């Protein structure tokens, strides 16, 4: 659009709408002092993106006024149903307004007026003077103002909307939008509309009649009696709703020169960015300096970072480590795969003030030792358990070294794992972030020295720059260790660290080193079948819709929307102003499947296509060419509840057969090594057993002590029948409620999930708590505990801070409540599994068994076992895992064995 880039365009930002969207667009973000700033950061980022993209000469920030507006005079209940804003929102607004003042953005607000009306009024005044206006907003109300000189830019969809785009999306002209909302209403603003008329009904009426007046003059032409009756009975509400929705003009007498904006003032916000700790925004301003002009950590603090390039210096360093018996170690690789990428150097620190980098894989180095020289010298030190090692993300470095035949012994601390325990969810735990947070010592990032300098990999770096970066890694790790150790003790989490999280590093290291075998021949057979099935589904769809659509992309929501809603004339389920495509998510397709066979086929096609693209095609690319196995990564720091997460690839998410691909058996491609079988050890209903123990609900505890089927027992009470008379469908409902109660089950969610009336779902939940009353009491106690401390703790002491627990906003409080309850139960269950893995790993070695834990899938372990050790291993597994704690609620482990993963899948 030519007018958008013209100097005759004024950008008007809906500040109030932006503020709320910015608040919810990011996870909570805080300064070191705990001040929430995510709305400020997100708001500024959105402004920056817009300024960079459009380089506006005129820019204005428009705000709603405080208190009542003229619409409240017309309708006192206007916006009455809105939740209280988050408690920290308005403090963040003050920072945003300060930012706008610093960079010279004019801010406009007027008592009794809303931002929408002010923007409309400014735009109309500009229009008279031949100027164009762009409303920067996602507010649907503003569509009514669209004209040749007024356009909307939705920053969240990165999309311009003019009158033509609007009419294409909505199916009627801009001038009819107030008519449309007179019928539909707006729940967010408590504008009533005409009850009983939804989006489709409103659209049909607006397309049939010219205006609200025309509609009421010709009510007899409304075909549906129910709709006609609703219109007759709610005429007053319809006209009121239109009045509330209409934008109104208010004189402002603003001079155009007051709206000018100079992009060069951006640097004025630097002190604010520094105060709020917006490091990326600070670096954006300061980072324009060449790296050589930026102060190095070694210069800033007077540290000495040395490069080791002679055998004499290497021998002297090894001697120092041998004498001190403690060392911080880091590795430098040419990539992120420790079992494949080339090791190019070691980073060493023995005492604060001096650190070393030993390069041996830098391609442009004039002089460096060989890899063999360095590793041969260091191997005796690295495998010596009496020499204490401190690392940051130890598992990665241990894998990098085992790739060269060195198994590290003597690890005593991992700063990454410690930091994850003691920090809040919003805090970053990378070494650079920890150095700046705890030591106030900024370090160069990988991007600073490699990516931004035009290098492709670490081994390309010149030695002096590599030394500054790498030696600082080991140096700061050594400095952080006593600080983080003390913080663990202070927060009562040292026992958790020492008994669970730290020893788990070795277990996960061994699992990742071992890897798992993938039979690509089986995968190719599955691929052949899936490819055939996809082709057949597409052919079937073509038969149903006609050959002219045979080239349609079934993975394109836009093309599918056109097919379903324009060609097949199926009713749109989700479509809002400003979207360029129809919603075709699985919920929509399942609803449409009752009206036409094509949507059901599309659901099946999508599931098969995802199976092929995400698993069948992708998994072989992860096979290590040296080992012939897949080595996934297990993270202890990715999930706030403490659960382990698998990535590269995610092997916790390998699907079992579904209704859409029965018989494909993707898991059958995963096999144990020759002579072994797979043993699955699965904790039965572990989270429910945790719930029973933590709540000490008598009925729940007794059910597990008696070995009853807990789902059948729950269902019997729900349906007022005996346990013997519970049918399968009833048990499924009992199961659904049992497992969902810890995830904040609501009547609405249950009714939607089970496709039952809301009132029935509400009764089921009430009966559940009547059956297990102590569960409700326990949940209340968790909320009280969280409110008292600001955090919830698991049974073993892991903390999770939940600031939303103090919210007056019901939506935010309910979310915080669910998080607190779920963290207590899921986090405790995760710790039981971790403790079980640690104890089992020790027991297998103690019994001289050759079984290896390969995977952890949340409540289940996949173990490779020699066939001649199967019976003994199974006994050890059950004995260890079932007795990991001494509770009055038994832990039960079910075991299965088979020749591939599919055979042991339930």
Predicted regions and their residues:
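Conserved "right-hand" nucleotidyltransferase catalytic core of DNA-directed polymerases
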Residues: 230, 234-364, 426, 434, ...
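Conserved RNase H-like, two-metal-ion catalytic cores of nucleic-acid enzymes
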Residues: 4, 10-11, 15, 21-60, ...
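Short alpha-helix plus adjacent loop in nuclease-associated cores
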Residues: 77-91, 95, 145-172, 228-230, ...
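A common structural junction motif
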Residues: 771-773, 879-887
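Noncatalytic, basic helical substrate-engagement surface that gates or grips nucleic-acid strands
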Residues: 2-136, 140-162, 237-253, 258-260, ...
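Acidic, glycine-rich two-metal-ion catalytic cores of nucleic acid-processing enzymes
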Residues: 333, 341-343, 348-351, 380, ...
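Catalytic palm active-site di-aspartate
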Residues: 414, 473, 504-513, 519, ...
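Non-catalytic nucleic-acid-binding/docking modules located in mid-to-C-terminal regions
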Residues: 4-7, 56-60, 97, 105-106, ...
